Regions:
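Hydrophobic alpha-helical transmembrane segments of multipass integral membrane proteins
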Residues: 25, 131-134
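N-terminal regulatory/effector-sensing and dimerization cores
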Residues: 2-86, 115-122
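Amphipathic alpha-helices that form helix-helix packing interfaces
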Residues: 102, 106-109, 124, 131
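Short, Lys/Arg-enriched, Trp-marked, Pro/Gly-tolerant hinge/linker segments that flank
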Residues: 89-98, 113-124, 133-168
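Acidic-residue sensor for enzyme active/binding pockets
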Residues: 18, 112, 130
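Aromatic/histidine-rich interaction motifs
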Residues: 79-104
């Protein structure tokens, strides 16, 4: 569980899918220049290599999970050609059920990590694979390969610049 008394995380990206599930409070999330306020009970997914930032002006508590794309590549065929999408405000009962199930999986992962009972890694990893299945089965969309590859190539060119900037 992430407890944030107030912070700003500037624009960045990483080679991981990031999920933020707000347990209490609110968080401003900007994804590729589109900002939205994430409220208690809402969940957002940020795809790998997508530029994003967060701003917390009031204390909040959230589950924040990053799944490295290299890990996902081992288990999800051609994951680099997929986007994971959902509308956190959907009124579609089937999608609401899928989102609620995913939130429950995230909550169970957090409980296993917080309590750490004997064999907790078995429990946590089984839930992680359940989450991967849910993402792949319920929320993935195939994208055109050239667009993904060009975007990744463009971002990889920026890596040395950002590394240099961070060091200096």
């Amino acid at each position: 569980t992430s407890v944030d008394p107030g912070s700003y995380v500037p624009s960045h990206w990483h080679r991981a899918v990031e999920i933020i599930y707000m347990l209490e409070g609110e968080l401003e999330v900007t994804v590729e220049r589109t900002s939205r306020i994430l409220l208690t009970g809402q969940c957002i997914l940020i795809n790998s290599n997508v530029i994003h930032s967060t701003k917390c002006t009031h204390p909040n508590r959230a589950i924040v999970l990053q799944i490295p794309i290299e890990f996902m590549e081992t288990y999800i065929p051609e994951v680099s050609q997929l986007l994971f999408l959902w509308n956190p405000e959907t009124q579609d009962p089937i999608m609401r059920t899928k989102l609620d199930r995913m939130k429950d999986t995230l909550t169970q992962m957090q409980i296993a990590n917080d309590i750490r009972p004997e064999g907790f890694l078995l429990r946590f990893n089984s839930l992680l694979f359940e989450l991967l299945f849910q993402l792949y089965h319920n929320f993935s969309v195939q994208v055109l390969k050239p667009n993904v590859n060009q975007k990744n190539k463009d971002l990889s060119r920026l890596d040395p610049v950002l590394t240099y900037t961070a060091r200096n």
